[in-house]
Amino acid sequence: MGISCSHLEETMSKPPDCLLRMLRGTPRQRVFTFFIISFKFMFLISILIYWHTVGAPKDQREYSLPVDFSCPQLAFPRVSAPGNIFFLETSDRTSPNFLFMCSVESAARAHPESQVVVLMKGLPRDTTAQPRNLGISLLSCFPNVWIRPLDLQELFEDTPLAAWYSEARHRWEPYQLPVLSDASRIALLWKFGGIYLDTDFIVLKNLLNLTNTLGIQSRYVLNGAFLAFERKHEFLALCLHDFVANYNGWIWGHQGPQLLTRVFKKWCSIQSLEKSHACRGVTALPPEAFYPIPWQNWKKYFEDISPEELTQLLNATYAVHVWNKKSQGTHLEATSKALLAQLHARYCPTTHRAMKMYL
């Protein structure tokens, strides 16, 4: 085609006068130049979206962890309640990190007589082919923790999300994993009822007295990182309908926090959120209940705090959301006085012991 900068890398690394000559060239040359620039731009955008969705690369030390863990002696009563506390892993990851372990352990310790069910999409149905890693080994120490495979097609079956999922699984979208997680938690609670928690929560108190409840993140938006609902509740049915009717997988949060906010405002016939609100049997608790530290201030979790200040900060908190999307990759010294380290030591001591041993 008579273009002197023929290869992609060469084209984008030439000085500006080369690019100017190409832009002044024949129509074919200009089309080719536009294609190269567009390709490089889209490639960069794809990388940024991936990092925004999945996060930065994990700490390499996690890949050298042992696969077995010596369980401590645990005095847990016999499980009497049905499986009503759920954690979901909708990616193919099957090796829980330390925050994931702490989330599940803290829930198990706060609810010793209830089943804490961890559903993981990457787990095979064949129980003889289960992965061996530190996270699975440690969580298996707790008699009330059940780790099971997650079949998304089966989960969405007989819900308004079935047709959506059959199409969505075959197309690319920038926020595919978060959207899938948003869909799964609503379908799960609609089908079975109970409590759902994100895997970056640390549970401080028993949550079983909370029914048909969610949390306010800020004055503008609710958050679905914690949800507690009865089986087949009408509010969840409206969420399922809105998920499909107003679907947009290209806007961050549109199918999650924004969806819950839209439905809640319609449910309560309100225009804006208050500090807390309850109507028609559904309660939105104030930010201090689950989001005592706003996401903008996530670094506070890694700052030192006195035990007295910690108690005062979390006095009205049921569970602490750590904003893993922002904080992942940040080094935490397990023996420090950092807020997060103190939470680990107090509410997930088994995970904390493993952190001190291996980090």
From Swiss-Prot:
One of its GO terms (molecular function) is galactosyltransferase activity. GO terms for biological process: globoside biosynthetic process; plasma membrane organization. A motif (DXD motif) lies at residues 198-200. It is a single-pass type II membrane protein. Residues 52-359 are lumenal. Glycans are attached at N209, N315. SUPFAM superfamilies: Nucleotide-diphospho-sugar transferases (SSF53448). Keywords: Glycoprotein, Glycosyltransferase, Golgi apparatus, Lipid biosynthesis, Lipid metabolism, Membrane, Signal-anchor, Transferase, Transmembrane, Transmembrane helix. Residues 1-30 are cytoplasmic. The chain crosses the membrane at residues 31-51. Signal peptide: none annotated. It comes from the Eukaryota. GO terms for cellular component: Golgi membrane; membrane. InterPro entries: A1-4-GlycosylTfrase_dom, Glycosyltransf_32, GlycoTrfase_DXD_sugar-bd_CS, Nucleotide-diphossugar_trans. Its EC number is 2.4.1.228. PANTHER family: LACTOSYLCERAMIDE 4-ALPHA-GALACTOSYLTRANSFERASE, LACTOSYLCERAMIDE 4-ALPHA-GALACTOSYLTRANSFERASE ALPHA- 1,4-GALACTOSYLTRANSFERASE. Catalyzes the transfer of galactose from UDP-alpha-D-galactose to lactosylceramide/beta-D-galactosyl-(1->4)-beta-D-glucosyl-(1<->1)-ceramide(d18:1(4E)) to produce globotriaosylceramide/globoside Gb3Cer (d18:1(4E)). Also able to transfer galactose to galactosylceramide/beta-D-Gal-(1<->1')-Cer. Globoside Gb3Cer is a glycosphingolipid of the globo serie, one of the major types of neutral root structures of glycosphingolipids, that constitute a significant portion of mammalian cell membranes. The conserved DXD motif is involved in enzyme activity. This is Lactosylceramide 4-alpha-galactosyltransferase. The gene is A4galt.
